[in-house]
Amino acid sequence: MPTAVLIDGGYFIKRFRRIEPHNAYNAQRAAEVAHRWAIAHLKHASGERRDLYRIFFYDCPPLRKKMHNPISGLCIDYSRSDEALFRTSLHEALKQKRKVALRLGHLTDFSSWTTGSRTFDDLLKGKRTFGDLQADELQPNVRQKGVDMRIGIDISSLALKRQVRQIILMAGDADFVPAAKLARREGVDFVLDPMWSSIPKGLMEHIDGVRSTCPRPLEQQRAHRGQLPCAIPGTTSAT
């Protein structure tokens, strides 16, 4: 049964950095485990191995603009940032992997700045004023565009063209639900891999199962062994 694995790159990178924080900017390692964890889905619980159709990795090129920080006035070249170098190297490494297709969206072309949610809360509650903000508390306000659309189109295309019998999606939100419904109506087995993160309430009714093939983040490993008094997001085995 041909299986396609679709990976939301932004989500994957966040979870990868929770699982292997010491490799946060190791692009080669990120590409290696993305491929490995995707391939791990091909092994059936009974020992049967499915055929791989393709691995799709969705992301955006990194921010490469030069921007002036509105507080310090310093010109920052974001093309030389750790994040930009990591993303560029990751994309190149993925292109070299067998049966991996890189799908790139784009970033919004706005030259605005923002700050963290906690800082916003403090500003709204009057605990701080805008005059208190420091230069290092600001970051460019950029958003991905076209990634969710590409995921939805590919899910629909794979299902309608009968190219696969199973779709594995590594993601963590409910944006894909309409496409998942279509795929299931076409007889496709739709499995979500949230990489051991909790999933939105009510999502289970729109998918055929949940399975994570990556290691648990360290704090979840401890909780799973009963060392921490916190709940572990439940997962449903998928075959």
Identify the residue ranges that each predicted region occupies.
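Domain-level signal for Mg2+-assisted phosphodiester chemistry and nucleotide/NA-binding surfaces
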Residues: 1-122, 135-136, 140, 189, ...
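Nuclease catalytic cores that cleave nucleic-acid phosphodiester bonds
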Residues: 104-239
